[in-house]
């Protein structure tokens, strides 16, 4: 597991995990710390590499949370919020989030703010512009179209990671359309206003530099903001 530089903002530890690391590394491929439901989920994957990656990323998350809570990984049990975001039912403010893409996982942990992370591996997309028009705000689409064609797909994927991170920090699931707010196609730190049915929420998002070909972002909710 690779500890990444802390982002500008509240204390957030970020970890990059190679899910294809040797089986001896930190017990990432052991089933011992997984719950019965996690083991059952791992057994339902059709492809062996998907099951292996699932086990590895859940073990990595539990190992990191165990270090934060001084608990054994086996004793950590997740509960889901209203829209499916996992939490630890410990009665203490420990926030975490995880994202994965093609053999890698990104994990964020904070004691001060609800957070969200997202990682994407660049890949060819036949009709990505149609998807971008549905997912980007009008301002983001306009900014995207000012870039040279060869840079547009990567910029769209970068924007997508920023939007995903914001929505995961908010814990809103799919109840908010990504095109209804601006997260920006640039990598810089940005404040983001997100309107839900009953309220308006303020988050911050910044893109993350990774030591491999991937795009990633971390977002955190501002005080007194969130569902």
Give the predicted meaning of each segment.
Residues 1-227:
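Core catalytic alpha/beta fold that binds nucleotide/phospho-ligands
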């Amino acid at each position: 597991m690779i500890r990444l530089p802390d982002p500008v903002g509240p204390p957030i530890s970020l970890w990059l995990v190679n899910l294809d690391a040797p089986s001896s590394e930190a017990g990432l491929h052991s089933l011992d710390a997984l719950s019965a439901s996690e083991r059952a989920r791992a057994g339902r994957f059709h492809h062996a590499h998907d099951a292996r990656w699932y086990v590895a990323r859940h073990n990595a998350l539990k190992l990191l949370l165990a270090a934060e809570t001084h608990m054994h990984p086996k004793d950590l049990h997740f509960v889901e919020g209203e829209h499916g975001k996992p939490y630890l039912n410990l009665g203490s403010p420990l926030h975490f989030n995880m994202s994965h893409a093609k053999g890698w996982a990104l994990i964020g942990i904070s004691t001060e703010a609800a957070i969200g992370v997202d990682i994407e591996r660049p890949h060819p997309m036949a009709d990505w512009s149609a998807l971008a028009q549905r997912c980007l705000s009008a301002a983001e689409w306009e900014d995207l179209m000012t870039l040279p064609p060869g840079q547009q797909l990567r910029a769209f994927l970068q924007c997508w990671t920023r939007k995903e991170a914001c929505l995961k920090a908010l814990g809103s699931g799919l109840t908010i359309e990504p095109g209804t707010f601006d997260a920006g196609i640039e990598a810089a730190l940005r404040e983001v206003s997100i309107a839900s049915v009953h309220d308006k929420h303020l988050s911050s998002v910044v893109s993350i530099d990774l030591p491999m070909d991937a795009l990633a972002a971390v977002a955190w909710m501002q005080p007194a903001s969130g569902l």
